[in-house]
Regions:
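C-terminal edge-of-domain segments
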Residues: 76-114
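Short, charge-patterned binding micro-sites
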Residues: 47-51
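A generic local secondary-structure boundary/capping motif
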Residues: 43-45, 70-71, 90-97
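Short, hydrophobic/π-rich interface segment
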Residues: 58-85
Length: 114
């Protein structure tokens, strides 16, 4: 069935020490959903479990993201997570530890049918 996109949230997460792409991605998802309350779902006769939640994470090293761990940040719905090249890595002045920044797009959709 076709889906209706209901909301798009964006977030940013940072790992200041360690270049941990998963940690930064989880923080980005948390940032994206932190101020959202999706009470409208019930207006469509649906429950939060009926939602489809599609997450795209942008990081410099997408292969370093544990997508299963990131998916656990979402409390409801059928969740899919993909990691793509993006984000930002800020090198340390000393050439050592860098700051890793992840961006997240969280898209919530509902099935058009009943």
């Amino acid at each position: 069935m076709p889906r209706i996109r209901c909301i798009t949230e964006m977030g940013m997460g940072v790992d200041v020490h360690g270049r941990d792409a998963t940690k930064a991605a989880k923080r980005a998802v948390s940032d994206a959903i932190r101020h959202s309350s999706l009470g409208f779902v019930r207006l469509f006769g649906k429950t939060p479990q009926d939602m489809f939640v599609d997450v795209t994470i942008g990081v410099p090293n997408p292969e370093g993201v544990d997508t299963s761990a990131v998916a656990k940040e979402l409390p409801y719905g059928t969740v899919t997570v993909k990691a793509v090249k993006g984000g930002l890595e800020i090198p340390a002045e000393s050439g050592g530890d860098a700051i890793l920044i992840a961006n997240a797009a969280v898209i919530v959709s509902l099935d058009e049918g009943k």
